[in-house]
């Protein structure tokens, strides 16, 4: 349902793997090394003891499920996504589709307040939940980015985190809902199927049998373009990653191709915070990451330039290749 990428994830090679788990309450000297190793080998990792209050997470999940449980006509009041707002099946502007409905929000407080009026019957409650969640995950993102910089031996460990705390940061929050498969014999269509995880735990977990393995695309193969993505999902699986840009680390860390499948009889909710720089910010490697022996692989460019290229291409297209340094003059700059 989504255009094939240059290096698609082959279904026959899909294997279950255990992602690295980073305990942020462990010794300060250990976390930077573990994060760098996880980024080099997987591009994904799980974080525990992260400090994001559980009540803030639950409030955000409750508001999300409450919105997606509304009739279609009510949800459409918050759309169409252009790019912000409510979207269903259509992803972006180039014809990509998937079995997903979503809310895309700018993290600017004023924008959240205005959008909430078309999203919720209680705009202040929704706006408060979103703002609290964004503040908490932004603080976590800053901590991870600073640990990452430390693990890379970058002298200025706040070189990345400063970009996402800038008042003009282009960070986003995307709430994704993947409905249950229509052909699942044990599909849960009751109102309780659209409840936060702490409510779902009281429900009977259905056995999907072979239907649960259907590879229907919820959100097709892609790489997140931002600096860092923090993903929270409920207890329903569906994320697949491909083990392989990397501008700010000069190719040392690579943004991993991944996709989401609607392979469950339960509704899947994911909340993704995309930590991004301001539009005017220049994207280039810190001095420690580019040396005469390992010159810059990419020419400097602004985040606005990259976003323009991103919106001109399909979901699975390679965008970073457009910015690769082509000659000695570009590398020297």
Task: Give the ranges of each region predicted by the language model.
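Peripheral, non-catalytic segments flanking oxidoreductase cores
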Residues: 1-333
